[in-house]
Amino acid sequence: MMIESVAISVKESMPPQVSVEINGMLNDGCTAFHEAKQSIDGNTIKIEVTTIRPKDAMCNQQISPFSTIIQIEGELKPGEYTILVNDVAEALKL
């Protein structure tokens, strides 16, 4: 799986609601988006995106796109953050 782009959206609310749109490519026709686990370490928000694939499946080798939107959990205080999706980083300023 390859992450191609990460787009951050902030809703003007109190506290701010942050969502992250993740776009990428899956390796073959059998691979699917599995989950996105998130954690916050200081001012770094880590999102680990994983895939799932049936064991021993015969799959076409066609790369296919995927897209998902993740809502950042927890209350973020004003400041500068780095959102790290697998190995793709984006800056966020609240």
Swiss-Prot record:
GO BP: DNA restriction-modification system
Query: Domain of life, per the record?
Result: Bacteria
| Keywords assigned | Restriction system
State the protein's purpose: Could be a silencing control element for the regulation of the restriction system.
Q: What is this protein called?
A: Uncharacterized 10.2 kDa protein in HgiCIIM 5'region
Species of the source: Herpetosiphon aurantiacus (Herpetosiphon giganteus)
Lineage, highest ranks first: Bacteria, Bacillati, Chloroflexota, Chloroflexia, Herpetosiphonales
